[in-house]
A protein has these predicted regions:
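Long, hydrophobic, well-ordered secondary-structure blocks that form the structural core
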Residues: 1-11, 17, 33-39
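Solvent-exposed loop and edge beta-strand segments that line ligand/cofactor-binding
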Residues: 1-10, 66-78, 138-151
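Well-ordered alpha-helical scaffold segments within catalytic/enzyme domains
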Residues: 13-25, 81-96, 114, 118, ...
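Hydrophobic (often cysteine-bearing) scaffold residues that line and stabilize catalytic clefts
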Residues: 10-11, 23, 27, 104, ...
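Short, flexible loop/turn elements at secondary-structure junctions
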Residues: 13, 20, 35, 59-61, ...
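Helix-terminus loop motifs that line ligand-binding clefts
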Residues: 25-84, 88-102, 107, 111, ...
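Acidic/histidine-rich catalytic neighborhood
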Residues: 63, 110, 114-170
């Protein structure tokens, strides 16, 4: 129990998919919690000189509970993991369970803004959009450029955000 019952990416990546289909109210509560702590995620992004929102790697109350260390702090894929789980839940249940669409739109827009500010078009790569200095799910291969999982999930996050955009998107 090294994580002491805290929320972290495993919640959305491994636990939430099961509950989405077997106990939707439980999955909904996980995702609503992420909506509830969005202001803290916005504060965290600002602390790291990023736009939008960056959810904490590990939390119990919306604040980052892990000590700062580069490999952990660079696990930005947490944002995409949350949006991917949220999208899966909404695709499965639509509006049947009353998820607040304004919160959905804001979560999507703010996490998309984080990716836009984290990545950059790099001239020596042919001006491809790169997301550098990140740590993917393999915590033992830390601080790399263009981690495949991170880049794939960032793309998913951006595409979901466009598809679910509303008044919050710009």
């Amino acid at each position: 129990e090294g994580y002491e019952g805290h929320f972290f990416w495993d919640t959305e990546s491994y636990v939430c998919p099961v509950f989405t289909y077997t106990a939707p109210e439980v999955a909904k509560s996980f995702l609503e919690y992420r909506g509830h702590i969005l202001p803290k995620a916005e504060e965290r992004a600002a602390e790291l000189n990023l736009k939008g929102a960056l959810y904490p790697w590990r939390t119990i109350d919306g604040e980052e509970t892990s000590a700062y260390y580069p490999a952990g702090t660079a696990q930005y894929h947490i944002d995409a993991d949350i949006i991917f789980a949220l999208n899966r839940f909404l695709n499965a249940h639509g509006d049947d369970l009353g998820f607040d669409q304004k919160v959905v739109e804001k979560m999507c827009a703010q996490t998309a803004r984080m990716w836009e500010s984290l990545g950059a078009f790099i001239p020596h790569t042919g001006n491809k959009f790169c997301i550098n200095d990140v740590t993917g799910p393999d915590e033992y291969t830390a601080i790399v450029n263009n981690n495949a999982f991170t880049n794939f999930m960032a793309r998913e996050n951006l595409e979901i955000s466009v598809a679910r955009s509303g008044s919050q998107a710009s």
